[in-house]
């Protein structure tokens, strides 16, 4: 059996190098894709990203990825969004005026100012796992530390989407969402040490279980 083949979407939203290297360390064969043609042939899809909501959505739509990502999620093709790749799944964002992908009902909101609170939320913070049996959390203890860099956070209309939260000042924000074969993290697993790498391995192993022709490399 071959290695899990993951398409990493390149839409000019930040440096994808660390995400690709993390996925390769997790046992996947990674290919950067700049157009949606052939996405269905991959075992799974990864959407990393840093930056602003509106330019990201403009790039995704201009390249034809908007429809392609929605179709991939509908057919239960394994999908992992990271940071901005989580936020664009929502319907809209306070950061801009562009509509999101509308895969996750809800809106992306900015952290509320409060005394002593640093915005952006940057650095290590702990995860409260709300979907304890999610495949992403296999072998991951509650209160694991993860690395964040963001000023906005997704607020799903349905709390059942929430797979983990974190606390920034007095505000509880969504750290991860999951449903079916879709997973997304607001934090950067590829920058979150051994447990972050374990999360990426968990995703690769989940993809392998969904695709009997592939298996993660040792």
Curated annotation (Swiss-Prot):
Binding partners and assembly: Heterodimer of HisH and HisF.
Domain Glutamine amidotransferase type-1, residue spans: 5-213
GO MF entries: glutaminase activity; imidazoleglycerol-phosphate synthase activity; lyase activity
Biological process according to GO: L-histidine biosynthetic process
Cellular component terms (Gene Ontology): cytoplasm
Protein name from the UniProt record: Imidazole glycerol phosphate synthase subunit HisH
Underlying gene: hisH
Substrates-to-products reaction catalysed: 5-[(5-phospho-1-deoxy-D-ribulos-1-ylimino)methylamino]-1-(5-phospho-beta-D-ribosyl)imidazole-4-carboxamide + L-glutamine = D-erythro-1-(imidazol-4-yl)glycerol 3-phosphate + 5-amino-1-(5-phospho-beta-D-ribosyl)imidazole-4-carboxamide + L-glutamate + H(+); L-glutamine + H2O = L-glutamate + NH4(+)
Enzyme active site: 83 (nucleophile), 188, 190
Keywords, in A-Z order: Amino-acid biosynthesis, Cytoplasm, Glutamine amidotransferase, Histidine biosynthesis, Hydrolase, Lyase
Pfam families: GATase
Subcellular location: Cytoplasm
Gene3D superfamilies, A to Z: 3.40.50.880
Enzyme Commission number(s) from the entry: 4.3.2.10, 3.5.1.2
Function: IGPS catalyzes the conversion of PRFAR and glutamine to IGP, AICAR and glutamate. The HisH subunit catalyzes the hydrolysis of glutamine to glutamate and ammonia as part of the synthesis of IGP and AICAR. The resulting ammonia molecule is channeled to the active site of HisF.
InterPro entries the record matches: Class_I_gatase-like, GATASE, Imidazole-glycPsynth_HisH
TM stretches of this protein: none
Pathway per the UniProt entry: Amino-acid biosynthesis; L-histidine biosynthesis; L-histidine from 5-phospho-alpha-D-ribose 1-diphosphate: step 5/9
